[in-house]
Amino acid sequence: MDFEDYNSTYEDSYTDDFDTIVALEEFSPLEGRVVRIFLVVVYSIICFLGILGNGLVIVIATFKMKKTVNTVWFLNLAVADFLFNVFLPIHIAYAAMDYHWVFGTAMCKISNFLLIHNMYTSVFLLTVISFDRCISVLLPVWSQNHRSIRLAYMACVVIWVLAFFLSSPSLVFRDTAHLHGKISCFNNFSLSATSSSSWPTHPQMDTVGFGRQMVVTITRFLCGFLVPVLIISACYFTIVYKLRRNRLAKTKKPFKIIVTIIITFFLCWCPYHTLYLLELHHRAMPGSVFSLGVPLATAIAIANSCMNPILYVFMGQDFKKFKVALFSRLVNALSEDTGHSSYPSHRSFTKMSSMNERETSML
């Protein structure tokens, strides 16, 4: 994702999307500094929690647990989030240096590519996990006979390759240019030449460039948000219906977990994608909508990368009965269910569930 994309000017020289200098015409120097400090602090916290939490999940899933389908999902999700957070310091430095890019054009392309790739990988993995759990409930016998670690790894390979393909525009359009004495890393959809004394043409003044911007933006919205949300929602509501029909859910907790998963995913990514769609018609919107909204929306979206380990531990748990060690909770959250029920593989259907198998039926 474009972490610096909240930083553009909204005038005739407007660049390809939210890039470079934090809305100079919208912010006073003091306001701009406050926004930069806010982003540096928030991104730093997310980076620290993301590297620590996902690193712990990677270690546990790799060295402390038996390989199962669930651990394959969780390991890949943690790796994607970990890589996402490893490259956050570059963008933290970019904001701290008043949006002066000193890392070169190649790193401008690569860092943004990796961030977009992580967005797609995480979303696709969450979707596959939801579909996998839905199949385990609807077709338990088939799932037991065909659900294998090899198939899970194959699915992960497809996900990473597909994410690579969808993220490749960053390698093509990401560019650097000079503006107001600073070097900016931005999306040059028009592919116009840049120099120390010039700035790329606004994409709406270049039909081809604006068309490329529309394709990239709409593709990200459809493939990175809308379609996954619809699939995840359909899977979880199907699970709820099946459980209630078979009276397997004895409490309302499973339904709360499902609703929370959907709402969390939706709230994290909806503002980000909404603002990018609005950006296509930014001239009809007040500049403050983007200069203030995009930093907040971006922070919320990237926070998703550090939330998963926390949700593994606490989702569906009663904090008043917090007696189990953190390490044990992570292991339980990542473990393949081995209990006995009509739908044995369904008890751990969510990557965020961590309940005691002796006492509770996990989703």
From Swiss-Prot:
Any one Gene Ontology molecular-function term assigned to this protein's record: adipokinetic hormone receptor activity
InterPro entries, A to Z: CML1, Formyl_rcpt-rel, GPCR_Rhodpsn, GPCR_Rhodpsn_7TM
Keywords: Cell membrane, Disulfide bond, G-protein coupled receptor, Glycoprotein, Membrane, Phosphoprotein, Receptor, Transducer, Transmembrane, Transmembrane helix
Extracellular side: 1-39, 93-109, 174-220, 278-283
Phosphoprotein in keyword set: yes
UniProt xrefs under SUPFAM superfamilies: Family A G protein-coupled receptor-like
Positions of disulphide bridges: 108-185
Region (Disordered): 337-363
Compartment list: Cell membrane
Gene Ontology biological process terms in this record: chemotaxis; complement receptor mediated signaling pathway; G protein-coupled receptor signaling pathway; inflammatory response; negative regulation of interleukin-12 production; negative regulation of NF-kappaB transcription factor activity; phospholipase C-activating G protein-coupled receptor signaling pathway; positive regulation of cold-induced thermogenesis
Membrane topology term: Multi-pass membrane protein
Annotated glycosylation sites: 7, 188
Composition bias type Polar residues, residue spans: 340-355
Protein role: Receptor for the chemoattractant adipokine chemerin/RARRES2 and for the omega-3 fatty acid derived molecule resolvin E1. Interaction with RARRES2 initiates activation of G proteins G(i)/G(o) and beta-arrestin pathways inducing cellular responses via second messenger pathways such as intracellular calcium mobilization, phosphorylation of MAP kinases MAPK1/MAPK3 (ERK1/2), TYRO3, MAPK14/P38MAPK and PI3K leading to multifunctional effects, like, reduction of immune responses, enhancing of adipogenesis and angionesis.
Family note: Belongs to the chemokine-like receptor (CMKLR) family.
Protein name: Chemerin-like receptor 1
Species of origin: Sus scrofa (Pig)
Gene designation per UniProt: CMLKR1
